[in-house]
A protein has these predicted regions:
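Sec-exported extracytoplasmic/periplasmic mature domains
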Residues: 5-12, 81-89, 119-127, 148
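Soluble non-cytosolic domains of exported or imported proteins
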Residues: 1, 66-75, 109-113
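A metal-dependent hydrolase signature that marks the N-terminal structural subdomain at the beginning
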Residues: 1-47, 143, 147, 151-155, ...
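Extracellular/periplasmic catalytic domains that process cell-envelope and extracellular macromolecules
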Residues: 12-14, 50-56, 109-113
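Surface-exposed substrate-engagement region within the catalytic domains
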Residues: 72, 76-80, 85-87, 91-103, ...
Length: 166
């Protein structure tokens, strides 16, 4: 629980309110990689056969291996970044009709690189995909502006939907 409370906003709220955190080996992750990986964000509840719809949808799995690695903070931050991308960024739209998630994927290369960019942005040091010493000032500013815009966008969208009864 302490690791969750140490997450930066907006990740802390998402993990506390919208995502289950499970200590264990994710069944589909283990089937795919033939080992228990450090962490997995599972938005739809995949089982070992790749079928989805199980009760662990919207979950972050952290394995014992991940906990004992000494990298728990960065692993949890990376997986929380996936949750933020899935639950928030894909619903945060630009005036072009493109989601900020798609825009961020184009900027950083893919979902894994985006999650690692968030690790760097929030001061983490260990990543698995995106190997940098530091995130550039330009990328840091871009992420900051994206978070600010999406917080504003989602808050106002929810207000309008509530006001209009949708």
């Amino acid at each position: 629980d302490l690791a969750i409370y140490q997450l930066p906003e907006p990740f802390r709220s998402i993990v506390k309110d919208e995502v289950k955190v499970i200590n264990g080996c994710h069944p589909y992750g283990e089937a795919l990689f033939e080992r228990c990986v450090y962490g997995v964000f599972d938005p739809v509840g995949y089982d070992a056969e790749g079928d989805y719809g199980n009760e662990w949808a919207n979950s972050i799995w952290i394995s014992d291996r991940g906990i004992s690695s000494g990298r728990l903070k960065d692993i949890l931050l990376h997986e929380a970044a996936h949750a933020y991308s899935y639950l928030k960024l894909q619903h945060c739209m630009l005036d072009t009709g493109v989601s900020f998630r798609d825009t961020a994927h184009k900027r950083f290369g893919n979902e894994e690189y985006l999650a690692d960019a968030f690790v760097y942005y929030f001061g983490g040091k260990w990543t698995n995909y995106y190997q940098l010493e530091n995130l550039s000032i330009e990328d840091s500013n871009w992420i900051r502006d994206m978070i600010t815009y999406c917080d504003w966008y989602i808050e106002n969208k929810e207000f309008l939907e509530k006001t209009l009864g949708r």
